[in-house]
């Protein structure tokens, strides 16, 4: 039995790269879609917010000397490319996906309209939110928090390369231990990087829990949705 009826899954663009240096790794995106399909078959309504860091990062090297707002818009367009790839892979896997963009590109994807997104979710379709919040200076983590709150998701699942939040960087400190669960205030007090400050504050204010887990662990998404001890739960 799933522990949640409606979830917001935040995927980083980097997660789509697999072992590649950039871009979209076909085997990786197919495997991710299989994991999502398994959850939808349990009757869970799934919405996805996807990043664009595998193609372009507004805050990174490719944008040196560039106007920040322009760089952020380029990053948003990168998320649209990822969303289209994810949606196409879902369609081929037998899922019905709908890509909705926060910036208008009507010939490519439909615009984000909240009632329409809710309708799609109720119909069992997977909704993929592209282009972040549609505004520069906001991360896709913030978009995940915002869309999660808007659609009434019960939890934001942040899929990362690490299987939870640790007391220290597990790559640098072998004594680092994983938190099973932690409150928002504790995470802030310990300066633990769960999400950026804006996204984190929005989730905290809306009492929207965050689960940090590794998308690279086979079956992890299903275990999270079933309420098992996987990753780290950040709660009020």
Curated annotation (Swiss-Prot):
Belongs to the UMP kinase family. It comes from Polaromonas sp. (strain JS666 / ATCC BAA-500). Homohexamer. ATP binds at residues 10-13, 53, 57, 160, 166, 169. One of its GO terms (cellular component) is cytosol. This is Uridylate kinase. Pathway: Pyrimidine metabolism; CTP biosynthesis via de novo pathway; UDP from UMP (UMPK route): step 1/1. Its main location: cytoplasm. Inhibited by UTP. GO terms for molecular function: ATP binding; UMP kinase activity. It catalyses: UMP + ATP = UDP + ADP. Keywords: ATP-binding, Cytoplasm, Kinase, Nucleotide-binding, Pyrimidine biosynthesis, Transferase. GO terms for biological process: 'de novo' CTP biosynthetic process; UDP biosynthetic process. It is found in: Cytoplasm. The lineage of its organism: Bacteria, Pseudomonadati, Pseudomonadota, Betaproteobacteria, Burkholderiales. Catalyzes the reversible phosphorylation of UMP to UDP. InterPro entries: AceGlu_kinase-like_sf, Asp/Glu/Uridylate_kinase, Uridylate_kinase, Uridylate_kinase_bac.
């Amino acid at each position: 039995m799933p522990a949640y009826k409606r979830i917001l899954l935040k995927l980083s663009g980097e997660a789509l790269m697999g072992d590649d240096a950039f871009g979209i790794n076909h085997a990786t995106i197919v495997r991710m879609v299989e994991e999502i399909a398994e959850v939808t078959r349990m009757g869970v309504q799934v919405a996805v917010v996807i990043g664009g860091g595998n193609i372009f990062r507004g805050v990174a090297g490719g944008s040196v000397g560039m106007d920040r707002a322009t760089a952020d818009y380029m990053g948003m367009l990168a998320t649209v490319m990822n969303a289209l790839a994810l949606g196409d892979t879902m369609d081929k896997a037998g899922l019905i996906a709908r890509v909705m963009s926060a910036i208008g590109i009507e010939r490519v994807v439909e615009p984000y309209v909240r009632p329409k997104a809710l309708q799609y979710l109720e119909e069992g379709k997977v909704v993929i939110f592209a282009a972040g919040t549609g505004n520069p200076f906001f991360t896709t983590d913030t978009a995940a928090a915002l869309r999660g709150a808007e659609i009434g998701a019960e939890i934001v699942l942040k899929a990362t390369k690490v299987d939870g939040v640790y007391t220290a960087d597990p790559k640098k400190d072998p004594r680092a231990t994983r938190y099973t669960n932690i409150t928002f205030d504790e995470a802030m007090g310990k300066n633990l990087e769960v999400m950026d400050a804006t996204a984190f504050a929005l989730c905290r204010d809306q009492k929207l829990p965050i689960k940090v887990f590794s998308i690279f662990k086979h079956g992890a998404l299903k275990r999270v949705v079933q309420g098992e001890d996987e990753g780290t739960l950040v709660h009020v």
